[in-house]
């Protein structure tokens, strides 16, 4: 057979192979140019190697002129399993070249080099809980845009009908909260609290009435939601971020003061917490605030306070509950006049130089700064000036048990936006920094770190 006839036969065989709907084996037709159907596939194409990957010798011996390091078997396996993500990951994408365009763009050039690693590492940030073991202040994962609401939408709700839910898993959604708390009553809306779009492990749920709020707190505070123990509290509006009010507070002027009337309740059963105390005295009128004093172990001391807006409600409470028996304990209810700056349902204690309570607060916050070593004490700055002590407990007890929390005031009694918080254990302090550092509270990004005394 002449060279011309042999060349014609080779061309016919090549055309026949390319037109055939059945893929031929690579081991067939020794001596001919390699079938490049793999390189022509979308996603596996590399123009710079299109013609360089031909055989120099026997196809069976796998002798390449293009210098490819993988066997024919692996090339065939990559082609046959091109739609299997696990199979794709077995092969190093770097061998495809920098001009390979994947499903979401160039896989090597779209991301900075610092994000690429020679070894795969597990991302624990989506697991919720304590988050990853990386640097402090790590956020949860980004919440899907369609699941997140704007800040204005989140704060524009009826706070008296809302609850605050803490210690959520990072994969929880507003729909999960709605489904879970619908067992209590009709849910108007549910939101996940975020910081710059990142899940912070906290949320809010709004009901149609305040009775559902009380039931939700009694039934689900300390319950398990998505395999995590959650905290459920009465939701409070963020402290006012009004500039005029801030300036008034800077000058020591207290505007819109609303006088409340307080009763002291003694000999309470240990089973009565602040929510139960509030429920009891709500029968006498509009309760502004209720609290039960706890000892160092978090156990009730049997003493509590209830504040009313109307003096008539106070007299009604004394008349009804003084000498009243609860679980065998006879209550002792007396009046104690107290003036509070009350804004939107939250008590703000007025600092007074001769107050022994504020003297203790000064001693607790005196010479305390941030940037300390790991310990139970937390230093928080950049708080809204209208933040109350009760706000501190509402915020920081979403993480764990708080032994003490105090606001710092300047020499004139004006707020400084600084607070010192002591947790019961150092693990809660760790989580507090991780979850609440840079958290937007009342329009202010909080700066939280371990505290130290000078």
UniProtKB/Swiss-Prot annotation:
Disruption phenotype: Sensitive to boron and hydrogen peroxide. Decreases cell population growth. The keyword Nucleus applies. The modification Phosphoserine is found at residues 338, 343, 355. Residues 25-38, 50-113 have a biased composition (Basic and acidic residues). PANTHER family: RNA RECOGNITION MOTIF RRM DOMAIN CONTAINING PROTEIN. Present with 1990 molecules/cell in log phase SD medium. Binds to intron-containing transcripts and is involved in quality control for the export of spliced mRNAs from the nucleus. Binds to pre-mRNAs until splicing is completed or until faulty mRNAs are degraded. On correctly spliced mRNAs, GBP2 and HRB1 recruit MEX67 to allow nuclear export. On faulty mRNAs, GBP2 and HRB1 associate with the TRAMP complex that guides those pre-mRNAs to the exosome for degradation. This is Serine/arginine (SR)-type shuttling mRNA binding protein HRB1. It comes from Saccharomyces cerevisiae (strain ATCC 204508 / S288c).
């Amino acid at each position: 057979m002449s060279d011309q006839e042999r060349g014609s036969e080779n061309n016919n065989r090549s055309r026949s192979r390319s037109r055939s709907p059945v893929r031929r084996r690579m081991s067939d037709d020794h001596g001919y140019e390699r079938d490049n159907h793999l390189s022509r596939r979308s996603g596996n194409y590399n123009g710079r190697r299109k013609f360089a990957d031909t055989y120099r010798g026997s196809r069976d011996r796998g002798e390449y002129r293009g210098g490819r390091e993988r066997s024919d078997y692996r090339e065939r396996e990559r082609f046959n399993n091109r739609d299997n993500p696990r199979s794709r990951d077995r092969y190093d994408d770097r061998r495809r070249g920098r001009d390979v365009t994947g499903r979401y763009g160039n896989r090597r050039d779209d991301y900075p080099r610092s994000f690429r690693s020679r070894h795969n590492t597990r991302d624990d940030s989506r697991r919720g809980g304590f988050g990853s073991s990386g640097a402090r202040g790590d956020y949860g994962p980004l919440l899907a845009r369609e699941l997140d609401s704007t800040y204005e939408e989140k704060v524009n709700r009826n706070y008296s009908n809302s609850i605050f839910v803490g210690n959520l898993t990072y994969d929880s959604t507003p729909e999960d909260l709605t489904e879970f708390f619908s067992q209590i009553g009709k849910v108007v809306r549910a939101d996940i609290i975020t910081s710059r779009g990142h899940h912070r492990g906290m949320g809010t749920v709004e009901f149609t009435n305040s009775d559902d709020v009380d039931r939700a707190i009694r039934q689900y505070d300390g319950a398990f939601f998505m395999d995590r123990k959650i905290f459920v509290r009465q939701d409070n509006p963020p402290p006012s971020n009004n500039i005029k009010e801030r300036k008034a507070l800077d000058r020591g002027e207290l505007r819109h003061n609303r006088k409340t009337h307080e009763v002291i309740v003694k000999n309470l059963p240990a089973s009565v917490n602040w929510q139960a105390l509030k429920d009891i005295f709500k029968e006498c009128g509009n309760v502004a605030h209720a609290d039960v004093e706890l000892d160092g172990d978090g156990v009730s001391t049997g003493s509590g306070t209830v504040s009313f807006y109307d003096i008539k409600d106070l007299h009604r409470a004394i008349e009804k509950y003084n000498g009243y028996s609860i679980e065998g304990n006879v209550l002792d209810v007396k009046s104690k006049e107290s003036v509070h700056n009350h804004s939107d349902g939250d008590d703000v204690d007025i600092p007074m130089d001769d107050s022994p309570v504020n003297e203790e607060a000064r001693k607790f916050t005196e010479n305390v700064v941030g940037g300390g070593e790991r310990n139970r004490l937390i230093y928080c700055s950049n708080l809204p000036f209208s933040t109350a002590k009760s706000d501190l407990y509402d915020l920081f007890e979403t993480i764990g048990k708080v032994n003490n929390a105090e606001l710092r005031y300047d020499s004139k009694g004006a707020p400084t936006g600084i607070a010192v918080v002591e947790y019961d254990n150092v693990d809660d302090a760790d989580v507090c920094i991780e979850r609440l550092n840079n958290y937007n509270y009342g329009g202010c990004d909080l700066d939280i770190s371990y505290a130290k005394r000078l």
